[in-house]
Amino acid sequence: MSTLGHQYDNSLVSNAFGFLRLPMNFQPYDSDADWVITGVPFDMATSGRAGGRHGPAAIRQVSTNLAWEHNRFPWNFDMRERLNVVDCGDLVYAFGDAREMSEKLQAHAEKLLAAGKRMLTFGGDHFVTLPLLRAHAKHFGKMALVHFDAHTDTYANGCEFDHGTMFYTAPKEGLIDPNHSVQIGIRTEFDKDNGFTVLDACQVNDRSVDDVIAQVKQIVGDMPVYLTFDIDCLDPAFAPGTGTPVIGGLTSDRAIKLVRGLKDLNIVGMDVVEVAPAYDQSEITALAAATLALEMLYIQAAKKGE
């Protein structure tokens, strides 16, 4: 099957099923798309249960449950009438070669950004965010990070490819500014001296959504923002299908409201990662991820309609 980059893809996990039944475009660089969806079926950097490579396919498949609603509640307009969104399928790389994946994903992102496109990416494990940050920083300069997760992923363990080290590496490479970055939903140990503002799950669950969003806006300011959502930010009651679930997380309702509240930020790139459908129940994790991805597109469409 010829897919992204006109490469022959014999992968057992890549998927050419368009998100929301959106049109597939395997050469999105020359398209008139505003936003391009890319799947990255990669889970070699996981430290927990593997299976995130099947995440993009699961998100796309369950998104058919969302495609029917045109004037989506509570937005009351059709995102597809304001944004031109295409799905370019999955990144093709030699399975087992983490370096090739990283280099190809960064090159793909750089080419899209140079063509004036914006990216919504489906992982895969969370390591895929690092090559995306490298590409976005080349185009937009140093960015703020808004990061939803149960873990800070700022661990300095010396591994080059590890889904728990990206946000230790990214500041050192000058890709993001921790002083203007926020990590939301954290409920595992972390280094309190890394510069990031951490809004742990306890306080995010206890505070009002408006209060949390006001603090995020104050910290981020007018910097370009990269938005990354690890599905294990949600409590396992709402997202069991992930590699490293942690009890005590956000509800899907609260997460959606928080994402909607980010509408006024200068978001330049977005991803949803760490869906591992082998551990899912009734596709609820994939549905949560697909819904959050759709809400991310809606906050972009809402700005375009203003």
From Swiss-Prot:
Gene Ontology MF terms in the entry: agmatinase activity; manganese ion binding
Ordered alphabetically, the record's keywords are: Hydrolase, Manganese, Metal-binding, Polyamine biosynthesis, Putrescine biosynthesis, Spermidine biosynthesis
Would I find Metal-binding among this entry's keywords? yes
Binding positions (Mn(2+)): 126, 149, 151, 153, 230, 232
* Domain of life assignment: Bacteria
| E.C. code | 3.5.3.11
Entry keyword annotation includes Manganese? yes
Q: What class of enzyme is it?
A: hydrolase
Cofactors: Mn(2+)
Indicate the secretion signal residues: none
Its GO biological process terms?
putrescine biosynthetic process from arginine, via agmatine; spermidine biosynthetic process
| Pathway where it operates | Amine and polyamine biosynthesis; putrescine biosynthesis via agmatine pathway; putrescine from agmatine: step 1/1
Its UniProt entry gives the catalysed reaction(s) as:
agmatine + H2O = urea + putrescine
The record's function comment reads:
Catalyzes the formation of putrescine from agmatine.
Assigned protein family: Belongs to the arginase family. Agmatinase subfamily.
Concerning HAMAP family, the annotation shows: SpeB (MF_01418)
Q: What is this protein called?
A: Agmatinase
Kindly list the organism's lineage. Bacteria, Pseudomonadati, Pseudomonadota, Gammaproteobacteria, Enterobacterales
